[in-house]
Amino acid sequence: RGRETGIPTLNHARTELYAMTGHVDVKPYTSWLDFAQHIKNPISIVNFIAAYGTHDLIEGEATLAGKRAAAMAIVLGVAQDVPANPDMVPPVLAHTINPPPDRLDFLNATGLHAGGELGGLNQVDMWIGGLAEEINEFGGMLGSTFNYIFEYQMEHLQNGDRFYYLSRTQGMNLLNLLEPNMFSDIIMRNTDLGDLH
């Protein structure tokens, strides 16, 4: 996930990028609902909330099924049944999770859930969150965060080489050099095919 190498979380990275550039595409997400509107599959927000959410309803569950059911109850606003799990210590009994009264505050990062870690949203790992982001209509095959980082990297690679190429082509007329250079000439220079004319 990159934590051991010091890679920031998705929202912390977006905060840093936005502070450096002011670029709207990397503006940090303000709530779980905001994040849900910018991922490929909006219902995936249930899995993100189950994994990273800090609502008491989620943290009170001991099993993955329980955490996911709690996230479903928060997102959908419908009671969810959790199956029994006798293998847990202590065993988990079958139970029903009802939607909490503050679920909309949690999803919108308002009320008691405003600020701070935004209900766990600021803990979403860069790699997982970045892969889940929707592909921009005119932005390549990556989500907005990874697309910005990729473009930034490519531009800096090109900038590093730009003076080399400028000095090598100074005084050349590109059209005059391209016109007599036929494809067969290129093949003859780079292979042992001989005369192709």
Language-model-detected regions and their locations in the chain:
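Terminal regions of secretory-pathway proteins
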Residues: 1-197
